[in-house]
Amino acid sequence: MSRIDDTFARLSETGGKAFVAYMMGCDPDFDTSLQIMRGLPGAGVDIIELGMPFTDPMADGATIQAAGQRALAAGGSVSRVLDMVRAFRRDDDATPIVLMGYYNPIYARQGGVDRFITEAVEAGVDGLIVVDLPPEEDAELCLPAREAGLNFIRLATPTTDDRRLPAVVRNTSGFVYYVSVTGITGGPAANAAEVAPEVARIRAAAKLPVVVGFGISTPEAAQAVAGVADGCVVGSAIVKLIGEGRPVPEILSFVADLAQGAHSA
């Protein structure tokens, strides 16, 4: 089993919920980003989602787009994000890490997909979320990644109907990421009552944990959404504090409050 599988198995034994925190790799710079990343497990984060900066992030709202631009300006890249993972793994071999991003910087990188998968596994990455690669293109990255031992996590949305859902979950592993609202990150607040039946539908089709993201920015929202799912993701609210240049302890304190909300569901 992967670290992701182990995490959900451990949580399910006690009825616990997973708290997943997203941050952009190399934002605002490599050292600060690594310092924040290293502090996440101690703040209660169960799974870390680490963004790979890209020039044209179509699914991201203004907050995460700005984070990507800051990271790129600081020399951030897929290679540097993998360096972050390697550095993190020197001190933490338990916390799952999921890289989240877009296909172009993976494909266009020297050595392409094969080199990326090899280096990701060697660095200690556990899973991938590639938001612009549909199931019809599974042979490009999803299947080779899974063969190498990586979980490949897909997004389901409010517009993923029962005809589309089987294709979405067919080669998904680790968990399914349910996008609670239609649109980009940092949008309107998630509604737990609306999310609950969708989570049940996806869980039944995928036979996997379902984690809900988008529209969660407070401990109360984390508690409400995690209560109807297997966990929740917070990204933009954390990235916003990083963008404001808040001290690392303040950022981690905010993350700890969010994690406590999710874990109290």
From Swiss-Prot:
InterPro entries: Aldolase_TIM, RibuloseP-bd_barrel, Trp_synthase_alpha_AS, Trp_synthase_suA. The active site is at residues 49, 60. GO terms for molecular function: tryptophan synthase activity. One of its GO terms (cellular component) is cytosol. It comes from the Bacteria. It is an enzyme of class 4 (lyase). It catalyses: (1S,2R)-1-C-(indol-3-yl)glycerol 3-phosphate + L-serine = D-glyceraldehyde 3-phosphate + L-tryptophan + H2O. Pathway: Amino-acid biosynthesis; L-tryptophan biosynthesis; L-tryptophan from chorismate: step 5/5. Belongs to the TrpA family. HAMAP family: Trp_synth_alpha (MF_00131). This is Tryptophan synthase alpha chain.
